[in-house]
Amino acid sequence: MLSGIEAAAGEYEDSELRCRVAVEELSPGGQPRRRQALRTAELSLGRNERRELMLRLQAPGPAGRPRCFPLRAARLFTRFAEAGRSTLRLPAHDTPGAGAVQLLLSDCPPDRLRRFLRTLRLKLAAAPGPGPASARAQLLGPRPRDFVTISPVQPEERRLRAATRVPDTTLVKRPVEPQAGAEPSTEAPRWPLPVKRLSLPSTKPQLSEEQAAVLRAVLKGQSIFFTGSAGTGKSYLLKRILGSLPPTGTVATASTGVAACHIGGTTLHAFAGIGSGQAPLAQCVALAQRPGVRQGWLNCQRLVIDEISMVEADLFDKLEAVARAVRQQNKPFGGIQLIICGDFLQLPPVTKGSQPPRFCFQSKSWKRCVPVTLELTKVWRQADQTFISLLQAVRLGRCSDEVTRQLQATASHKVGRDGIVATRLCTHQDDVALTNERRLQELPGKVHRFEAMDSNPELASTLDAQCPVSQLLQLKLGAQVMLVKNLSVSRGLVNGARGVVVGFEAEGRGLPQVRFLCGVTEVIHADRWTVQATGGQLLSRQQLPLQLAWAMSIHKSQGMTLDCVEISLGRVFASGQAYVALSRARSLQGLRVLDFDPMAVRCDPRVLHFYATLRRGRSLSLESPDDDEAASDQENMDPIL
């Protein structure tokens, strides 16, 4: 376990924030008349001698004198809080001619910014403090004491906030305003997005000790690969990591478009700007030297790569060489900190021809670029220890008679209810499209069409590749659907939740009403996805967060948790494919396996050797879930061709 708990200690601080700050002094008319930009500053919440809530701004260095601002009647604009930006407007003082002061916060770690804003809101609501003192009271009063850092938020303050429910005028996401010079539109928007309030966690989500160790290593600037079986919280941890890092200089990528969309990033190929990566190295370097692409490489300080198992070794080596060439640094990966996540025992790289794939850990540059490796071992997705043990055996390519018996017994499971049928996971995307189209056509009634609104329709193909929603969604009464975005975790409306369309609004947009397996019935409104195209261009798609769910591909299910699953393993063609499919299920009771063949359970021996080496060298745990049974387990390994 890594030491250096202090590296991550700041993650849990709610009253302090380090970021870029621009201080604007406004005229009485609201126009900026003086501006000071601070590349790095520390904001602290505290109180003065009269218990007034104050904000202290401290610039680095001995010359940076702290400034304190009273927070009475402060207004906070949080439309871009998820991107690490916010604006705090402080009202004018009683001094004649004085104007308001505006603090523009940027490059904040998004999670820390959210907690900072939540603390501010709770403190303002619980104890707004006395009004401003008169000049006479200030002269006759005690000498001002030093700034006192605010106390942590207390349970009583949370209860008071919930009980009073004062109108929240401080934390508001403002609607998008039309650009200057643009002609006003007379057409009503097809997909009006409801104004959402800033999402702030009611409590501090706790990381497990092994997850905290990964975060500490990242915050210390170490390049790291963290791995773990399906359901160990890799995706959740990756989002926590991204929320703890400054947005500037942090690039989130993944090997596939869907995985990239889940973490709010772009594909590794789109960031690199070298096309498919099949060209010779000199040509790849030339492609990366193009102005827009080159600047992306130069600005990158931390590169996140998710689903690393699907990145081929030759591509990784080329990217490493391109990084050194473009950045003109001979350090590993050009001095970029790598934060790599994935499980090599899941889906392998896609290759053409009969040649077996070469995994990233087989690349020449892997060891020098990734000095730290940590494994997550606690499974969060499944609660049944029997099912967890079964999945761990399948992950290692072990299919004993008991594992075979348990999986074959699921063929009789009735995994759907209330008109909701199981989603069938298919090995080939063509089967998915045909199944969903056929089942939709078989339903009686009218087809309801919902077209997406794309920020750039000419780049719809890029959005199709990276968004979990399609440009056109067709639904009927009784259509099987899946939620592809978290709407309300507490109510069970999460990514992967299964449901059935039970109606459509009679008025307005005719939005679908969906009854979910968790028992909730909800009218589904449009949501927005933002992806990054080649060259850093941001694209957005506005669409219902639904997709047809009679069938979906195993590749697109990677990283998801499904309520009820039906799997056919008869056409499994890659190592790890059976394991990925089986591990999507939340429970053994929600799983039905058809035509099970023990030979479908296999893994690549090179990956087993890689993990065994890590276990010996870094104390990684890769023991069998059942040591007594391990000796008799049959290991189905793909031959190395």
Curated annotation (Swiss-Prot):
Q: Where does ATP bind?
A: 228-235
Q: Name the tissues where it is expressed.
A: Weak ubiquitous expression.
- Catalytic activity, per the record? Couples ATP hydrolysis with the unwinding of duplex DNA at the replication fork by translocating in the 5'-3' direction. This creates two antiparallel DNA single strands (ssDNA). The leading ssDNA polymer is the template for DNA polymerase III holoenzyme which synthesizes a continuous strand; ATP + H2O = ADP + phosphate + H(+)
Domain of life here? Answer: Eukaryota
- Keywords from the named record: ATP-binding, DNA damage, DNA recombination, DNA repair, DNA-binding, Helicase, Hydrolase, Isomerase, Mitochondrion, Nucleotide-binding, Nucleus, Phosphoprotein
Locate the region PINT: 1-180
List-wise, which residues carry Phosphoserine?
27, 151
Q: Does the keyword Cell inner membrane apply?
A: no
Annotated GO CC locations: chromosome, telomeric region; mitochondrial nucleoid; mitochondrion; nucleoplasm; nucleus
Factors inducing expression: Tightly cell cycle regulated and expressed in late S/G2 phase.
- Which InterPro entries does this entry report, sorted A to Z? DNA_helicase_pif1-like_DEAD, P-loop_NTPase, Pif1-like_2B_dom, PIF1_helicase, PIF1_RRM3_pfh1
Q: Which GO terms describe its biological process?
A: DNA recombination; DNA repair; mitochondrial genome maintenance; negative regulation of telomere maintenance via telomerase; protein-DNA-RNA complex disassembly; telomere maintenance via telomerase
Its subcellular locations are: Nucleus
Instruction: Return the annotated region ranges for Hydrolyzes ATP in the presence of both magnesium and single-stranded DNA.
Output: 167-641
Q: What is its EC number?
A: 5.6.2.3
Free-text function comment from the UniProt entry: DNA-dependent ATPase and 5'-3' DNA helicase required for the maintenance of both mitochondrial and nuclear genome stability. Efficiently unwinds G-quadruplex (G4) DNA structures and forked RNA-DNA hybrids. Resolves G4 structures, preventing replication pausing and double-strand breaks (DSBs) at G4 motifs. Involved in the maintenance of telomeric DNA. Inhibits telomere elongation, de novo telomere formation and telomere addition to DSBs via catalytic inhibition of telomerase. Reduces the processivity of telomerase by displacing active telomerase from DNA ends.
- Full protein name: ATP-dependent DNA helicase PIF1
The gene it comes from is: PIF1
